[in-house]
């Protein structure tokens, strides 16, 4: 049986993933996404459980070229202020962890950045299922 607290954490994670997927679009940056989404997490009381990163590259194509021509402040890391371009692909990757309560979640989904949003490559819906 899940506790109300466990369901609260699960709902938080579902909320932040949905907000993240709705925030991606051409013209925004990893930094602007992080700022917007961490503000949401803080307002709802779960920012302490979020790892404040929301994407990573996908390998030999996608956003990895930015690492090879890095112009950001951290060597070998993607510049957090680069601007997403239409038709760019990244992995929407999120982590939520509350070690003191032995609960955490991870989400990864390849996405295609579009002019006004993003297209998810995974066709599995994000939802909370309680199995008893």
Residue ranges of each PLM-predicted region?
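Active-site neighborhoods and metal-handling regions in enzymes and metal-associated proteins
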Residues: 1-132
């Amino acid at each position: 049986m899940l506790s109300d607290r466990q369901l609260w954490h699960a709902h938080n994670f579902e909320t932040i993933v949905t907000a993240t997927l709705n925030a991606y679009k051409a013209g925004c940056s990893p930094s602007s996404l992080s700022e917007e989404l961490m503000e949401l997490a803080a307002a709802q009381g779960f920012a302490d459980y979020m790892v404040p990163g929301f994407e990573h590259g996908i390998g030999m194509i996608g956003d990895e070229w930015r690492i090879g021509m890095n112009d950001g402040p951290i060597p070998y890391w993607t510049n957090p202020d680069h601007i997403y371009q239409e038709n760019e692909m990244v992995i929407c990757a999120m982590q939520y962890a509350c070690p003191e309560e032995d609960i955490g979640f991870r989400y990864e989904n390849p996405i295609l950045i579009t002019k006004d949003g993003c297209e998810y490559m995974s066709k599995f819906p994000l939802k909370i299922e309680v199995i008893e």
